[in-house]
Each structure stands twice: as C-alpha cells, then as structure tokens.
Amino acid sequence: MAAAKDVNLFGTDGIRGHVGQHLTPQLALQVGFCAGLELGQDASPHQPFILGQDSRNSSDMLAMALSAGLTAAGLDVWHIGLCPTPTVAYLTHHTEAVGGVMVSASHNPPADNGIKFFQANGTKLPPTTQGKIEQRIRAYSQQQPSGTWGHHFHRPELTKSYTDAIQTPLHAQVDFQGLKVVLDLAWGAATQLAPAVFKAMGAEVICLHDQPDGDRINVNCGSTHLAPLKAAVNLHEADVGFAFDGDADRVLAIDCQGRTVDGDYILYLWGKALQQQNQLPKDLIVATVMSNLGFELAWQQQGGTLLRAAVGDQNVHAEMLNHGSMLGGEQSGHILCPHYGVSGDGLLTALHLATIICQNKTRLSCLVDDSFQTYPQLLKNVRVEDRDRRRNWQECQPLQTLIDQATDDMGDQGRILVRASGTEPLIRVMVEARDMRMVNHWTDQLVRAVETHLA
C-alpha cells in the first residue's frame, strides 16, 4: 500500500479530520503500524497497547484498523471499548503498556473523527515523536512487519481501575448525599462511567443524552451546546449540572441560576481549595491566552499568580512542568491537576467541583458569586477552508492594521486574540473589554476583515 501523501498529520490534538476524506481506515492502519514500530521499539514481545474509542459510527472501523496496524507491529492490543480519553491516558500510565491511543474527535461533529496517542507515562506525544511517526508513514512501503504478530483482546473491565482511582480518594473525604446533579453526556464517551461514579458517590443523578447511537455525538448537546442542560437544571431544581464533550476530557458546569461556570471559574474555585490545603505550590495557576482578565485580577487579589500559555492542553501542560504548577487548564473546560491525573479529565474535574460544593455546604451559585466578575468577552469563529491562509493569517496586512487600531483604542481596558484553530478549519476572533459596546464593535470589524481577506 502506498504511503499517505499528506504526512503532516498531527495537529494540536492528534490526527483529526472528516472520515472518508482526510481520515480513512487505510490511513489508520498505516498510523497504527508506524506508531507501533516507533513506540514499541524497546517493547517486550506482546507488550500491550491501550485502545479506546468514543461512540461515533466510524470509531469501530478506525479502532479495528489501528489495532491491525499495532498487532502487525508486534504489540498486543487491549481494547477498552467506549470510554473517556482520560481513561486511556490513565491505563497507559498504570499498566505495562508501551502506549495508548484514543479514537475520537472530541467536540467535533459526528462526521469527523480523530486519533490521539499517549506515551507510556500517559501524556500526549511530544512533537518530536509525532515527527518520527510521520517519517515512518512517509516510508510506509519500505516498513517491514515485526515478524511477531500481536493479538487483540477486549478488556472493558479495566475501566474499573480508572473509576476507582478518581473516586476512592474523594469518597474518603465526602459523599454527595443530598446533591442533585444533571449530567449532559453528549451521546459520547462518558455515558457509561460518569453516571455510575456520581451515583456511587451518593448523588441523585439525572442524565441527558446518555443513549449514544453513533449519529448524534455533540449534536445540540454537551459542552458546546449548554441550553438543554440549563433547562434541565431549572426543571429538576438541581444543585449543579455538568456538560461533557464527546470524549469527556473537558467539562463545563451550570449553577442553579442557569449561569455557565467555565474553566476559568473552575480553576479559581479548585485553586482556592488547593491553596487552603497548602497543596498549590507558589499559588500558581497556568491558564491560556483565552482566560478572562477578571479571573486573572481576582486570582492576584487571592495572593496567587496566573501564567498564560498558548491555547491547547499540551501547551498548558508544558508551562506547568516548566514552572512547577499543580493546576492549569483552559476556559473551555480542559483542566489539569497532576496530583490526581496525568491528563485533562472532565469526569475527575466534575467530581472535584462537586466535592468543593459539598465541603463548603453551599450551592455552586454562592461560590461563583464570591469569586470574580468576568470582563465582557466575545468569541466568534470564521470558517476559512484554505489551509495556507489559515496558517499564515498573520501575513494579512489589512487584518493586522485593524488589530493594531483596536489594540490602541482599547488600551489597558481590553485585549484582542486572533488565532487559527488547530483542530477545525476556523479562524477564531476573541475580543475582551470592560465595555460591551467596545467588544461588539471591534468583534464585528475583525470578523468582517477575516471574511473579506481570508475566507
């Protein structure tokens, strides 16, 4: 079989694309084989590789193709089946596996899918390793099978060690008796594990979008569409609602007043709890350039320091390692706390936020009221199909001129962020300022410029 023509496969969060066009079973086979050879260079015969997947119709097909490639590379595959991405990261780290892989496109539409690898310590592959896998794919026709074939094993029972690990330490401190929780499972990867864990902790659980059919993952539900969760929290008079994305590596919350509690609020509340327990070195949190200025100022008033990384949990993780931080994350709900897990984990984060609510014997709405006021912020996405234009948007002089004008106009009362998405064909425009009129004005101007000169 010929090698994949496009060997720049890895984006900011693995390989992702439209199934049948950018992502095919043939490509998945090549990727599995080449990743198996690269990550399994020093592996013992039949050393395992962890494989998980979300609920998309294409996930079975791609998982089987990956498994064929991995077993051809001489590795045994432990197929966990439907599970959150953090489950794969955890099991990769806590078993003898040489690596792990998750088939999911996270929050993307059902027609997309993706392949996300983990190294033996449970963290995502560094760019250097991704580059080596791409080099192997480039020379795919010259790659030779290992001569020792691996085997494919169904191992869904392994998820219990993951749920025990995230649940047991918290259950020793608190139970969720009296807490009414609504879970929006986005017809995705958390549909089996999240309700079971919350019920085991003692919560009353109401589930939304918990019967995946393969066609509707993330469609008008989950962390990218919060309206159903807000309505359900109000209808059931719940204490809190949690919305996961398709692979459950992120979570957003809704309080009893229907307000969105995003990653900034979660970082502030979790950071404050860790600070009070003397478990937050240097009182340092790593956020991203997308985090709200109101959060940063409030955390400074709390005696802490907020560092900003580029967007992407890998960038957050790198800054956390560089500065010795034990808490970091993104406004979108990717939260990292190395003391409890090696990757962003929506279910783990939801459990800790629920624990903070119960330990404070109050409602999430009260905790939010006592935290900070956000600056008005508006984020708009503009679809730009041309890949080169997306990557090189900074070379667009009319857009740069407009950004300079807006920056001068707002001064220290606001900020602008324009960036290309690493996972979708989008240019993202974010404007933040004290004055909402200023936010609306400059957002409209910038979006119009992107549409005119790039789209």
UniProtKB/Swiss-Prot annotation:
> Can you name a GO cellular component term?
cytosol
Among its keywords, does the record have Magnesium?
yes
Keywords noted in UniProt: Isomerase, Magnesium, Metal-binding, Phosphoprotein
Give me the residues that bind Mg(2+), please: S106, D245, D247, D249
Modified residue Phosphoserine is at which positions?
Answer: S106
Single annotated GO MF:
phosphomannomutase activity
- Family matches, as Gene3D superfamilies: Alpha-D-Glucose-1,6-Bisphosphate, subunit A, domain 3, Alpha-D-phosphohexomutase, C-terminal domain
Q: What remark does the entry make about the cofactor?
A: Binds 1 Mg(2+) ion per subunit.
Q: How is it modified after translation?
A: Activated by phosphorylation.
Entry keyword Cytoplasm:
no
Q: Which family does it belong to?
A: Belongs to the phosphohexose mutase family.
Q: What is this protein's record name?
A: Phosphoglucosamine mutase
The record lists the organism as Acaryochloris marina (strain MBIC 11017)
